[in-house]
């Protein structure tokens, strides 16, 4: 077997092991040592293929994005009205994130880094793959926004910007749904008058995922229509 093929196979083994650990334990609890142990190699070998933990995370996210791309493609029906298409894509994104909590953690872990900081820790080739994966997913939303603009239903000056907003907003909502923790003031001894914030200790409550999806779908369509001046 050529050395290049062996290297590619080993790299694939490392990524598969990382993905399995992410899905099993979550991103926070996955360590380089655990990945090396799962593959049956020394951790030093991992650093021959990846510059560090951030680059390994980025390449694992590329795998998640490829699957998300397929899910968004399957959900979109080009013959449907733009608003319905946007609702379907929003639902598909949220369902994917709900089924893959580690995807949300991995994406948010990288989003916490400034672009210039990430470039210092991740090679240009990996950043390119990550960018292609992100763009492929965002393009589903962009095409729907552009279709809605052509019919006059949507008013979006910068479709890619709004698609990026949807992406980061969706990750935040998925984190809320995963934590199942929303803060309420319903246990306050007295409620404030004239719409004032009630006093008392906050309480916590569950987050109904179907209701979250409905809010996100309506919100996405409203933003695309320009109903949020």
Model-assigned labels for residue ranges:
Residues 9, 13, 21-55, 59:
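Helix-turn-helix
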Residues 17-21, 92, 96, 176:
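Short amphipathic alpha-helical elements of helix-turn-helix/winged-helix folds
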Residues 24-28, 79, 100, 151:
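Short coil/turn segments at alpha/beta junctions that flank glycine-rich nucleotide-binding fingerprints
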Residues 59, 73-103, 163-166:
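Hydrophobic alpha-helical connector segments
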Residues 62-68:
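Short, basic, alpha-helical segments at the C-terminal edge of helix-turn-helix-like DNA-binding modules
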Residues 95, 135-151, 164, 168-229:
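C-terminal peripheral helix-coil segments that are non-catalytic and often amphipathic
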Residues 95-143, 160-161:
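Short secondary-structure transition hinges
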């Amino acid at each position: 077997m050529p050395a290049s093929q062996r290297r590619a196979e080993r790299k694939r083994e490392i990524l598969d092991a990382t993905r399995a650990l992410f899905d099993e334990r979550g991103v926070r609890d996955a360590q380089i040592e655990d990945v090396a142990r799962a593959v049956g190699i020394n951790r030093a070998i991992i650093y021959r293929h990846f510059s560090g933990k951030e680059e390994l995370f980025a390449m694992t996210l590329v795998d998640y994005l490829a699957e998300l791309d397929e899910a968004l493609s399957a959900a979109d029906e080009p013959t449907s009205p733009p608003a319905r298409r946007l609702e379907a894509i929003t639902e598909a994104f949220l369902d994917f994130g709900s089924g893959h909590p580690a995807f949300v953690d991995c994406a948010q872990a990288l989003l916490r880094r400034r672009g210039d900081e990430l470039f210092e820790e991740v090679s240009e080739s990996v950043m390119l793959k990550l960018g292609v994966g992100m763009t492929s997913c965002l393009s589903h939303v962009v095409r729907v926004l552009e279709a809605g603009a052509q019919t006059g239903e949507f008013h979006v000056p910068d479709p890619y910007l709004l698609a990026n907003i949807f992406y980061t907003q969706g990750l935040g909502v998925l984190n809320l749904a995963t934590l199942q923790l929303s803060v309420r003031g319903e246990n306050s001894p007295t409620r404030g008058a004239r719409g004032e914030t009630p006093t008392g200790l906050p309480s916590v409550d569950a987050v109904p995922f179907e209701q979250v999806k409905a809010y996100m779908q309506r919100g996405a369509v409203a933003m695309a229509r320009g109903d949020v001046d």
